[in-house]
Amino acid sequence: MAQVKRIRRSISGILVLDKPRGMSSNQALQKVRWLLNAEKAGHTGSLDPLATGVLPLCFGEATKFSQYLLDADKGYETVMRMGITTTTGDAEGELLAERDVTVGRDDLEQALPRFRGDIEQVPPMYSALKKDGQPLYKLARAGEVVEREARSVTITRLDLLSFEPPCATLAVSCSKGTYVRTLVEDLGQVLGCGAHVAALRRTQAGPFALAQAITLETLERVHAEGGPEALDQFLMPEDSGLLHWPVLQLSEHSAYYWLHGQPVRAPEAPKFGWLRVQDHTGRFIGIGEVTDDGRIAPRRLIRS
């Protein structure tokens, strides 16, 4: 007997998942997509399988704005294990070297300031970055090491939360593209003992914080009790990741032309930059950019 194809739901919104350890970001996305029975889904930047915490998942029309969450600053808490270096820079890699740890709390506190602000990082070999079309982690698994250019990143917070040798817990706030594994490895090198990431928890992704994140266990329980529709309560509006942007409400007349791809004039709009755009009822209809001539050009539109 032929299996009946499951008809997926056309839903839109953002769900902030508290990703469990041991699951890739894509595995987590596909699991939640199945629970929601969603037609279209995407995540907003990978978390390593080792890592837990904030992973915003976009569904339906919200996927059009996932790039702007990829570009957002992130926050983490990480446990740094001093004295041991690994091939991957975290607890999942093979042991490279082991040293005695004679580092004191004051030593660590004194080393932190050099990693605050704008710094240069060399991305790790075990990363999704590509070299000649090949992901670096695939080359690393084949035993290859290739030259990687240093990249500029910004560390806005790097504080010591606890110190229990050989481990220390750090709070990190950073720009996009920052590798906490590399930060910990570089810090371990400065301390002279080496280090790797023993645990990593993302506490912030743009405007989304851990307090808003829903565990997979909660989603599974609610799904078991009420099916996919019961999970809609956890969906946030499509523009939830853009609430820090200025908002512009268009008249009914202007919104009509704007939604048909035409730039419009709005005297109350800012002189430059990107905007969240609403129609005359206050409904979010997309994002726009102020052009050189002062008009508001549509860049991403919500399908009604």
Curated annotation (Swiss-Prot):
EC class of the enzyme, as a word: isomerase
Catalysed reactions listed for this entry: uridine(55) in tRNA = pseudouridine(55) in tRNA
Pfam families, alphabetized: TruB-C_2, TruB_C_2, TruB_N
CDD domains (alphabetical): PseudoU_synth_EcTruB, PUA_TruB_bacterial
Gene Ontology molecular function: pseudouridine synthase activity; RNA binding; tRNA pseudouridine(55) synthase activity
Its EC number(s): 5.4.99.25
Keyword line: Isomerase, tRNA processing
Record-linked SUPFAM superfamilies: Pseudouridine synthase, PUA domain-like
A GO biological process held by the record: tRNA modification
Gene3D superfamilies in UniProt: Pseudouridine synthase, PUA domain
Family the entry assigns: Belongs to the pseudouridine synthase TruB family. Type 1 subfamily.
Protein name, per record: tRNA pseudouridine synthase B
Species the sequence originates in: Pseudomonas aeruginosa (strain ATCC 15692 / DSM 22644 / CIP 104116 / JCM 14847 / LMG 12228 / 1C / PRS 101 / PAO1)
